[in-house]
Swiss-Prot record:
Function: Synthesizes alpha-1,4-glucan chains using ADP-glucose.
PANTHER family per record: ALPHA AMYLASE DOMAIN-CONTAINING PROTEIN (PTHR45825:SF11), GRANULE-BOUND STARCH SYNTHASE 1, CHLOROPLASTIC/AMYLOPLASTIC (PTHR45825)
Family to which the UniProt record says this protein belongs: Belongs to the glycosyltransferase 1 family. Bacterial/plant glycogen synthase subfamily.
GO-annotated biological processes: glycogen biosynthetic process
MF (Gene Ontology): alpha-1,4-glucan glucosyltransferase (ADP-glucose donor) activity; alpha-1,4-glucan glucosyltransferase (UDP-glucose donor) activity
Official protein name in the record: Glycogen synthase
Metabolic or biological pathway, per its Swiss-Prot or TrEMBL entry: Glycan biosynthesis; glycogen biosynthesis
Amino acid sequence: MRILFVAAECAPFAKVGGMGDVVGSLPKVLKALGHDVRIFMPYYGFLNSKLDIPAEPIWWGYAMFNHFAVYETQLPGSDVPLYLMGHPAFDPHRIYSGEDEDWRFTFFANGAAEFSWNYWKPQVIHCHDWHTGMIPVWMHQSPDISTVFTIHNLAYQGPWRWKLEKITWCPWYMQGDSTMAAALLYADRVNTVSPTYAQQIQTPTYGEKLEGLLSFISGKLSGILNGIDVDSYNPATDTRIVANCDRDTLDKRLNNKLALQKEMGLEVNPDRFLIGFVARLVEQKGIDLLLQILDRFLSYSDAQFVVLGTGERYYETQLWELATRYPGRMSTYLMYDEGLSRRIYAGSDAFLVPSRFEPCGITQMLALRYGSVPIVRRTGGLVDTVFHHDPRHAEGNGYCFDRYEPLDLYTCLVRAWESYQYQPQWQKLQQRGMAVDLSWKQSAIAYEQLYAEAIGLPIDVLQEA
């Protein structure tokens, strides 16, 4: 199949969230399965310093009264072509830059559509999140190009009807209430990044006011769990960690813990229970819940806690103050550093993901890969990847709690801390986590089926739904 990925992010060049990881990883696996896969994304001003292969101009197009150029390079470590849409609108040195995002990404989506009509015609356009939401609308009249739309985070829905009509000149009945809603209506197939999240977003609690529409199109809605790049994230070969190891050489992992304690200014002690937290410091990631119990947990236990991330100033201040109250026990780095995040995965005993909602989540999978036991709230993709430890039957790979309540999180942390004292059992738990297949292989096969279904659908998806 000829498949074109269209997205605002693509790792390792431009990444803010999990979408960048998907777009940077899945095409490689699909290419290995024999498909002609290509990627289309904006040519941001900061990309030149990151390109291994210089981008060469190959085509000039016209969209929404603006000329643009398309440049070609390659995704690193593969022969997947990467097309970059060049225009002054994408010159800012960050991906998301404020008030003009609605116009910028609608223009980008229109450019991708023009490229597909006039230069390289795919059988399937795989659209990602609201930035590409108008593509299924425009492709509605192209019977030989089908569309698949992936929801990475339903909370971000793009410009709403009044602004969308002004930007695109499409009549309101061809749009829905936002670019996200437009894509849900017109895409041949819609999927989320985990099976559980696909079910949850059809309810008022998680539906972000689109639960009615999502229930209506449930016949073409599915969930496919994300994978991770197991070649890049490999504790046996990762050059950014101190000691390489795998589940058969778990004793070497202690060197990573001791090095992390030293790097983060903690007491260097192999017996301390070290918990890692790497996330955006926003409510979605459960930081408000964590702050309600962290002081109490640290005063009750002898555990250590490390935080890496940036976000809302209020949460940053609270974490910083806690770190000053527990010197040698807690360390807060208000930044993002890819190398340090890997060292936290490799050196922590447990990894906390207490999300309010989580479409898929990648950090818990990276923690499993590196031997850090995840402690998670059962929601979205966390339900599909982390299973509660059952010592009696030697099952499970982490610790889970259900309700978004301080007591539930506190109890789960205490239970994990107490279990850590029994090292033979804890090491078996780590080994079970490291044995989980987290690669893209099974997910890629599921996407193959999704593309095949999209191509076989009647073009009038409203009647099909």
